[in-house]
Design a protein with these regions (language model features):
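Conserved beta-strand elements of beta-rich interaction domains across eukaryotes
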Residues: 55-58, 89-92, 114-117, 186-187, ...
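N-terminal leader/targeting and pre-domain segments
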Residues: 2-48, 78, 82, 87-92, ...
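Conserved redox-active cysteine motifs that mediate thiol-disulfide chemistry
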Residues: 53-67, 103, 184-190
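A short, hydrophobic beta-strand/beta-hairpin element that forms part of a small beta-sheet core
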Residues: 49-50, 68, 104-124, 216-254, ...
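Amphipathic alpha-helical interaction motifs in eukaryotic regulatory proteins
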Residues: 39, 43, 51-54, 62-65, ...
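Non-globular targeting/processing and membrane-anchoring segments
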Residues: 20-22, 147-416, 437, 471, ...
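Thiol-based oxidoreductase modules, predominantly thioredoxin-like and allied folds used
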Residues: 29-35, 53, 65, 72-73, ...
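Alpha-helical bundle/repeat cores within regulatory domains of eukaryotic proteins
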Residues: 405-510
Length: 510
């Protein structure tokens, strides 16, 4: 009997790996290659390739996928010169390819220069793959070095302009572009190289490298200045924008794109025939509904992605996680198997000492997940929290939904309990989890400020707790309304949208 169970389990595992699903999809600016497409795409190509070899069943790869997707989005304009690529080594048909490239751990990232001819041309990336800005600069350095070494036909784009060259002469090489960017830096000129690659195929702007002592730079900045960027509009002799000291290349890129929208070669046409403004979105009641699918996706992402992002959890972080798991096990809504999963994980984490290896966490979580029939999904899916774009709403919406659902569940369970302490039982555990484990660092810091500003620690009753979450949520929505994180299809609104909707929405939410 025991052998039969082992064989059944082994077959299930083999089937799972043979039919491995990708961590990436068509919406990502990433090319997924396989054994039968890798050589044709990478070898003897005009483009360089930056390749992540990953396993779709590897916890580290699952946690890293959002980072690599974000990195690929940033490098989307670089695709004429370098392509971000992935290979799923968990897929049986790709195992020979991964062995050929000596991929022994996941994720492994390699740079293949343009014109590569074999596996030996792959350079393993040894930098910090979690530091996106630095990885982008490292790719620029790889490309610059390979162009220089191979005397590539485009190697000249990285050459600094001669110190004798005037601003007018720089414009002469700008073609029909209305904007000229001068990036000032000594070697290694990582910021200029990245910007030159980024805008290489953009007809709106020409970016050139100049040394800090170039007369045009000195005149504009009144001194030699390393690591600065000057943006000129055609016809002007003074820059319309100068980067602050220490600006990252991507911040400069975003600023240049803002000016392209105003002064680019297509800007006049858009002014002559302006597009009709997008219609004001009416209140869509579904955006205020609580959907079990959203809650399950949020809990899945929280447990499987957010918590295991670090190798170890210890000290105050572990205390905070224990408190949050206790809150979840008591008040998180969901199916009976989900509540059992949270209860068992809470029992397990409280049995630990002062340090938790997140590999142990993931293993235990997977063990409990399987034993309960996989009550949580293996990927996120959004209904009420779906955004018009993949990067909008989703998990952050799900977090707010979970907070509201837990606060309402706690209210219903404890409203007549005079001993109930909403701060200790619900609010502070949620606050500390967000502050310590939310992968959006800036979001975590902002919520920490909101908790202090709105006096979280002074909440006394279950009713005040429910209202506190809505008050803070409304405040955050007001602050972020119209920002880049606002979804035009589901604008950030105050809750409830009108007094007449209160009863309807409460019925939906509870």
């Amino acid at each position: 009997m025991q052998l039969r169970c082992i064989l059944i389990t082994l077959c299930a595992v083999l089937y799972r790996f043979a039919n491995a699903e990708s961590l990436y999809d068509a919406q990502d600016p990433i090319v997924e290659l396989e054994t039968d497409t890798f050589n044709a795409a990478v070898y003897n190509s005009e483009k360089a390739h930056f390749v992540e070899f990953y396993s779709s069943w590897c916890g580290a790869c699952i946690a890293y996928a959002p980072t690599f997707k974000e990195f690929a989005k940033h490098l989307a304009p670089w695709r004429p010169l370098v392509q971000v690529t992935v290979v799923n080594c968990a897929d049986d048909k790709n195992m020979p390819l991964c062995r050929e490239h000596s991929v022994n751990s996941f994720p492994t990232i390699k740079f293949f220069k343009q014109g590569s001819t074999s596996k030996d041309d792959g350079q393993q990336y040894t930098g910090n793959k979690y530091e996106i800005n630095q990885m982008e600069l490292d790719v620029a350095a790889y490309l610059h070095a390979s162009y220089e070494k191979d005397k590539h036909r485009l190697a000249g784009i990285f050459d600094p302009v001669d110190n004798t060259k005037t601003l007018e002469e720089m414009w002469a090489s700008a073609g029909s572009a209305n904007l000229l960017g001068i990036a000032s830096q000594e070697d290694p000129a990582l910021m200029p190289w990245a910007l030159i690659i980024n805008f290489h195929a953009d007809r709106n702007v020409k970016v050139v490298l100049a040394r800090p002592q170039h007369p045009v730079v000195v005149r504009a900045l009144e001194s030699e200045s390393n690591g600065r960027f000057l943006l000129y509009k055609r016809g002007d002799i003074t820059p319309i924008w100068t980067s602050p000291a220490g600006a990252k290349w991507r911040d400069i890129q975003e600023k240049v794109n803002e000016y392209i929208a105003i002064y680019g070669v297509d800007a006049k046409a858009s002014l002559v025939e302006p597009q009709a403004p997008a219609p004001v979105a009416n209140v869509d009641m579904t955006q205020f509904q609580v959907q079990l699918v959203d809650l399950k996706s949020t809990i899945f992402y929280m447990l499987f992605k957010e918590i295991p992002r670090r190798q170890f959890v210890e000290g105050d972080d572990l205390v905070a996680l224990k408190q949050w798991m206790r809150t979840m096990s008591k008040y998180a809504p969901g199916t009976t198997p989900i509540r059992r999963l949270l209860y068992r994980m809470n029992e397990w984490i409280w049995s630990l000492g002062d340090k938790m290896d997140t590999n142990d966490w993931t293993n235990k979580l997977q063990e409990v997940q399987v034993s309960l029939g996989n009550p949580l999904p293996d990927k996120v899916e959004w209904i009420a929290c779906i955004g018009s774009k993949p990067n909008l709403r989703g998990y952050t919406c799900g977090l707010w939904t979970t907070a509201h659902a837990i606060s309402v569940a706690a209210y219903k369970a404890e409203k007549n309990n005079a001993q109930f302490n909403p701060v200790n039982e619900v609010m502070e555990p949620f606050h500390q989890f967000i502050f310590r484990f939310l992968s959006c660092g800036e979001c975590a810091k902002n919520f920490n400020k909101e908790a202090e500003k709105h006096k979280l620690l002074q909440v006394k009753t279950a009713h005040e707790m429910v209202m506190w979450f809505w008050r803070v949520h409304n405040f955050v929505n007001a602050r972020l309304s119209g920002s880049r994180t606002d979804d035009p299809r589901f604008p950030k609104r105050q809750f409830p949208p009108s007094a007449s909707d209160v009863l309807h929405l409460l019925v939906l939410a509870v």
